[in-house]
Swiss-Prot record:
Superkingdom, natural source: Eukaryota
Chain segments carrying region Disordered: 78-124, 565-592
Organism encoding this protein: Homo sapiens
Catalytic reaction list: S-ubiquitinyl-[E2 ubiquitin-conjugating enzyme]-L-cysteine + [acceptor protein]-L-lysine = [E2 ubiquitin-conjugating enzyme]-L-cysteine + N(6)-ubiquitinyl-[acceptor protein]-L-lysine
Chain residues that bind Zn(2+) 1: C317, C320, C337, H344
Gene: BRAP
Tissues of expression: Expressed in breast epithelial cell lines.
Taxonomic lineage from the root: Eukaryota, Metazoa, Chordata, Craniata, Vertebrata
Record InterPro entries: BRAP2/ETP1_RRM, BRAP2_RRM, RBD_domain_sf, RING-H2_BRAP2, Znf_RING, Znf_RING/FYVE/PHD, Znf_UBP
Start-end of Basic and acidic residues biased regions: 80-94
Secretion signal, residue range per the UniProt entry: none
Residues in RING-type zinc fingers: 264-304
A cellular-component GO term for this protein: nuclear membrane
Protein name: BRCA1-associated protein
Gene Ontology molecular function terms on file: identical protein binding; nuclear localization sequence binding; nucleic acid binding; ubiquitin protein ligase activity; ubiquitin-protein transferase activity; zinc ion binding
């Protein structure tokens, strides 16, 4: 269960005294008084900041509205008499300090001066205090706010050690109130009885020594009757903060996260939905539900706004639905609109020959045959003309009565006959239309049954086809899954083969390069070997030739010398012949 904590703000006039010990805050241990006041007046300071004095006064007056400051009586009752005595002395000293100081100074002057006479020894001014010392009277307005955030009633949640009894009947005296709270006298720290301009009731603030004591009092006394005779009950709320502010500080301006509780116009009590049910009317005025139940009128108690809508005519034309200028047939009860709207009443006369129709607004009867009003006209017995009939009581003649009865009988007979013919024809038409409609419905019913049968056959075929398609789809899904796995395997294998192919290509290129280098080396070696072989063959051939020469020639070759000229290239013919043999000789010589 959750409740809303309340904030009590006492807005004082400019020259009103400040009540002693009125301030209270449940969060006093968490925040200092300056921080609490700064937080409270934050929105008011923001609203009044940068405004001229005239604009500030206008804003304050606008929020104050028609509320007037009145005398607020605060009576304090403490459990300890010594504390009450100390408070009274503080009040006496604060209120009478200027007078007491002046009387003290004057008495000193009188003592220091020479006493000429006994009367000069007495002081001119003597300070005194009149009235009940525990009662304070201030001038202002009492504001009651509730927090927009709900607070739980669990034991581990911080609420407040101060409770407020919103409405105490004026017939209940202070002695009766003390009897009501007698079981909790030991845990009550102080009580403040607040009386403002609200008649026949007052408010009580009760401060306990601890929150647990306040919770116990709340659970015990909330919703409990003050006595067994009266119906008034104790309405308790937790007080989060009680503060005193001056009007020029913006005390009447709205407070952030708080909603001011209005007064019920009927009972003049504060309206709190957590305590009593609140009913808001169509004109946006709120009252206690019980108070509005006692209000016998259907209008709003404040503005006299009618809460229930006016009754609307339910009659309307049977053909077009118009609700104006309606006529009802006196024979069959058909309602139709007049000739100045859509003429449905006259069309009904043309169809049924029902002569008489009555206007619903003024109950005047119209005769369509005679084309005039007949609500006070009868036919004369002598000439049959229509004359106005006025009943004169006992002076009415029997002949006129007989004529009227006879004419009424004729009229009733003719109308009943025409009505019988009309309704018989209508019944025949209705039967004919009903028979045709029944035949049409039977035909449609047969067609619908055939369509349903065809649809059932189609549905069965489609279900079978669906089953076969589902089987095929299942098989295809299996194949697709298998092919997907094979595809993944082939892709992995292809990936591996590509990697191996790249490695083999690199190896092949390396082998080709090595082979090419080897071939080049072999070719070079072969070329060198061929040259060596050619030299060897040339040497052997030369040696053989030299061996076949005579000894003298061999001797000459051995002793011979080979001279290579510088210009051997320019004369190849001369050097070729002479150089060949020496070369051979040299070789043969080297061989030997």
């Amino acid at each position: 269960m959750s409740v809303s904590l309340v904030v009590i703000r006492l807005e004082l006039a400019e020259h009103s005294p400040v009540p002693a010990g009125f301030g209270f805050s449940a969060a006093a241990g968490e925040m200092s008084d300056e921080e609490i006041k700064k937080t409270t007046l934050a929105s008011a300071v923001a609203c009044l900041e940068g405004k001229s004095p005239g604009e500030k006064v206008a804003i304050i007056h606008q929020h104050l509205g028609r509320r007037e400051m009145t005398d607020v009586i605060i009576e304090t009752m403490k459990s300890n008499p010594d504390e009450l005595k100390t408070t009274v002395e503080e009040r006496k000293s604060s209120e009478a300090s200027p007078t007491a100081q002046r009387s003290k100074d004057h008495s000193k002057e009188c003592i220091n001066a020479a006493p000429d006479s006994p009367s000069k020894q007495l002081p001119d001014q003597i300070s005194f205090f009149s009235g009940n010392p525990s009662v304070e009277i201030v001038h202002g307005i009492m504001h009651l706010y509730k927090t927009n955030k709900m607070t739980s009633l669990k034991e581990d949640v911080r609420r407040s050690a101060m409770l407020c009894i919103l409405t105490v009947p004026a017939a209940m005296t202070s002695h009766d109130l003390m009897k009501f709270v007698a079981p909790f006298n030991e845990v009550i720290e102080q009580m403040k009885i607040i009386r403002d301009s609200t008649p026949n009731q007052y408010m009580v603030l009760i401060k306990f020594r601890a929150q647990a004591d306040a919770d116990s009092f709340y659970m015990t006394c909330n919703g409990r009757q003050f006595n067994s005779i009266e119906d008034d009950v104790c309405q308790l709320v937790y007080v989060e903060r009680a503060e005193v502010l001056k009007s020029e500080d913006g005390a009447s301006l709205p407070v952030m996260d708080l909603t001011e509780l209005p007064k019920c116009t009927v009972c003049l009590e504060r309206m709190d939905e957590s305590v009593n049910g609140i009913l808001t009317t169509l004109c946006n005025h709120s009252f206690h539900s019980q108070c509005l139940q006692r209000w016998d009128d259907t209008t709003c108690p404040v503005c006299r706004y009618c809460q229930t809508p006016e009754p609307v005519e339910e009659n309307k034309c049977f053909e077009c639905g118009v609700q104006e200028n309606l006529w009802i047939c006196l024979i069959c009860g058909h309602i139709g609109c007049g000739r100045y709207v859509s003429r449905h009443a006259y069309k009904h006369f043309e169809e049924t020959q029902h002569t008489y129709a009555m206007q619903l607004t003024n109950h005047r009867v119209w005769d369509y045959a005679g084309d005039n009003y007949v609500h006070r006209l009868v036919a004369s017995k002598t000439d049959g003309k229509i004359v106005q009939y006025e009943c004169e009581g006992d002076t009415c003649q029997e002949e006129k009565i007989d004529a009227l009865q006879l004419e009424y009988s004729y009229l009733l007979t003719s109308q009943l006959e025409s009505q019988r013919i009309y309704w018989e024809n209508k019944i025949v038409r209705i039967e004919k239309d009903t028979a045709e409609e029944i035949n049409n419905m039977k035909t449609k019913f047969k067609e619908t049954i055939e369509k349903c049968d065809n649809l059932e056959h189609k549905l069965n075929d489609l279900l079978k086809e669906k089953q076969s398609v589902e089987r095929k789809c299942t098989q295809l899904n299996t194949k697709v899954a298998k092919l997907t796995n094979e595809l993944k395997e082939e892709q992995e294998m292809n990936k591996c083969l590509r990697a191996n192919q790249v490695l083999l290509q690199n190896k092949l290129k390396e082998e080709e390069r090595v082979l090419k280098e080897t071939c080049d080396q072999k070719d070079l070696q072969i070329t060198e070997i061929q040259e060596q072989l050619r030299d060897v063959m040339f040497y052997l051939e030369t040696q053989q030739k030299i061996n076949h020469l005579p000894a003298e020639t061999r001797q000459e070759i051995q002793e011979g010398q080979i001279n290579i000229a510088m210009a051997s290239a320019s004369s190849p013919a001369s050097s070729g012949g002479s150089g060949k043999l020496p070369s051979r000789k040299g070789r043969s010589k080297r061989g030997k």
